[in-house]
Amino acid sequence: MEAGPSRTSMSPAFSRAVHGTRAVFGGALEWDGADALDPSAMAVTALGMGVPILIGVLIGRPNIGLAASLGAMWVGAAPRGASLKEHWRIVRDNVVAAIAAAVAAAIIAQHGPRSDVGLVLAAGAAALLGGFSRPMAVASQRFIIFATIGLGVAAHTPNRIALVVLIAEGALWAALCGLAIGVAARRFDIGSIVASERESTASFEQKFRHWRTMLRTWAAWSYPVRLTACLACAAAIRGAFPQHHYSWIAVAVALLTQRQSDNLIAKVSQRALGVAAGVVATEAIAIHPLPGWALVAIIAMLAALSPWLRNRSYFACTAATTPLIMLLTSGGETIGQGLLIDRLVATLIAAGLVITAFLVARRFMPRPSPDNRRPG
């Protein structure tokens, strides 16, 4: 009886496929329990998102509470700095990105095909500006994700100015919760403190010259080109199938596209699996009308789980965050099974777009010359 093919006889392509599959599913099942539970971070996100929706339910307008909770979600996850000054800087950047994204979404929304063009241009400009500095890179990625999510809400909102105000109020409320709980947590040594990064000593002129020089290289354009190409494809697919709810493709593209290309295929696949699992979980949560108290409890619970899962499991964190996003953008309406199936398909389409764009862009990246390779 002949033995099966040995490892040495496997083709390189098959070997890479096996290795990649192990990396994706192995990484999805990994669980890092080294970090201690941080009740302060969980309290910030639970109160930041739970209180606005509670107020909305109490006054009989859950959609108002959901809009404010959306702004809180964009800010509440800010890591706690070692000092109030450092914490304020982190929270301030998140608040600015959230409000700017809400304003951009309100301006771009409800203009037909021009809205798609506006999103692509705004996201591309933000991605390009993100190369100016590391803080700008972080802020630009937040802006892109927030604006894409916000556009989906603003597209179905009759009063977009009120939506911006509610999102801003939720963001400011979450910022106050974070700063207040942060002061108490530092005073009583509760939870963990994010490691502070050393601020750059380069002047604005030096950063600008460096950024302008980088714009002459493909590395500076790779992320903006990949992102805008995928968003344009997402808009085209949604327009080609108007009977489906494929606006989620753009949201998934914004969530899945990364500036850094290290292990991108494995990370995108893991996050796509997490989003798909989150969509399936949403069916169990919201396929039937939820009473007000249940909506508040579920949103507060999912919000509290997010910071706890963030450093433990990439897959589990994404799976918990996805129902949160879907509930907050639902306007308090029941999420039907057809919508969930469409969003599951949209997630897979987005993952395919992001990975394809990366593989195409990688062909244009300059290969390191043999002289520059380290020996050994």
What are the roles of these predicted feature ranges?
Residues 1-143, 147-320, 328-376:
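Alpha-helical transmembrane segments and their membrane-interface boundaries
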